[in-house]
Curated annotation (Swiss-Prot):
UniProt membrane topology term: Single-pass type II membrane protein
EC numbers on record: 2.8.2.-
Protein name: Carbohydrate sulfotransferase 10
Membrane-side (Cytoplasmic) residue stretches: 1-6
Species per Swiss-Prot/TrEMBL record: Rattus norvegicus (Rat)
Gene: Chst10
Length: 356
């Protein structure tokens, strides 16, 4: 009998210790695609069930636009912008697209989002979609310069000098507060045309002299993906396409580090299914979208978007066809499979003229 009481007491003690320990279990978000081994702590302790449910509701509320960002507050909002947000909401619900449309709100994502506290704006950077000009707008709004024309080009991309903090630099509470209450936007363009722009800018022209693209990344891609190893030409678009469409490219991505942001999907950059953005602009309609974004953010009386050269934002099917000429249908289909989420979330037509 005495032994039974001891056994019963021991069981209660184990259960009690397990309950206490569970309160200190940490939950983490990992960087998407393993771009960084570092983990970001989102919740510091586990919570009782009722409190946990409230916490989950709070976290979902953090991601929802409020106030001026709700469509109900803008009965005169042009339908095209509401349709873009609705398209994203519907695509995010598609189970078949889940692996291509969802990502974690990790440090990698938070590093892409620039903050203007003075005017409560968050801008997610999507390289090769005219981001330099939007950075200039935010730099002026933050007060580092009085006009866009005064900003030296080298300062725009020097994030220690341009006065643009990243969302990742704030505390967990600060991040959640800004995600919940600030005006949030980013810009997209046709995914394949964006890849062409990235290839030209980083591997052909390289105007900002970033030697690592030609001297480190290009040789790595050529060694892995060039069919004719005796060919001595520099990297070709075909090599780039094979690399991007390879499901097993992850080890190369890890080697290349954050330099890959110029061709990472919009989903991985900005987490549009997890963060409820206020406006999604399109590069192809930037002449109308830029003034609209400034107006919705309440800053159109303070700054103007730089002049857009005529025709520069138009989709160029001929250019796309020329770049993909001679590339196998298999490689193009694999590339599309990777970027299908970007095509569908943002309403870009499937490029059947390349795939069939």
């Amino acid at each position: 009998m005495h032994h039974q009481w001891l056994l019963l007491a021991a069981c209660f003690w184990v259960i009690f210790m397990f309950m206490v320990a569970s309160k200190f279990i940490t939950l983490t978000f990992k960087d998407p695609d393993g771009y960084s081994a570092k983990q970001e702590f989102v919740f510091l302790t586990a919570m009782p069930e009722a409190e946990k449910l409230r916490g989950e509701k709070h976290f979902s509320e953090v991601m929802k636009p409020t106030g001026k960002m709700l469509s109900e507050s803008h009965p005169d909002q042009p339908p095209v912008y509401l349709e873009r947000l609705e398209l994203i909401r519907n695509a995010c619900k598609e189970e078949a697209l889940r692996n291509l449309s969802h990502t974690e709100v990790s440090k990698f994502v938070l590093d892409r989002i620039f903050v203007c506290d003075k005017h409560k704006i968050l801008f997610c950077q999507t390289p090769k979609v005219g981001n330099t000009q939007w950075k200039k707008v935010l730099i002026v709004l933050n007060g580092a310069f009085s006009s866009i024309e005064e900003i030296p080009e080298n300062v725009v991309h020097d994030h220690e000098k341009n006065g643009l903090p990243r969302l990742s630099s704030f505390s967990k509470i600060g991040i959640q507060k800004r995600l919940k209450t600030y005006f949030k936007f980013f810009i997209v363009r046709d995914p394949f045309e964006r890849l062409i722009s990235a290839f030209k800018d980083k591997f052909v022209h390289n105007p900002r002299f970033e030697p690592w693209y030609r001297h480190e990344i290009a040789p790595g891609i050529i060694r892995k993906y060039r069919k004719n190893r005796t060919e001595t030409r520099g990297i070709q678009f075909e090599d780039f396409v094979r690399y991007l469409g390879d499901p097993n490219r992850r080890w190369l991505d890890l080697q290349f580090g954050d330099h890959i942001i110029h061709w990472v999907t919009y989903v991985k950059l900005c987490a549009p299914c997890e963060i409820k953005y206020s406006v999604i602009g399109h590069h192809e309609t930037l002449e109308a979208d830029a003034p609209y974004i400034l107006k919705e953010a309440g800053i159109d009386h303070l700054v103007s978007y730089p002049t857009i050269p005529p025709g520069i934002t138009m989709y160029n099917r001929t250019k796309v066809e020329q770049y993909f000429l001679g590339i196998s249908k298999r490689d193009i289909r694999r590339l599309y499979a990777r970027f299908e989420g970007d095509f569908k979330l943002f309403g870009y037509q499937k490029p059947d003229f390349l795939l069939n």
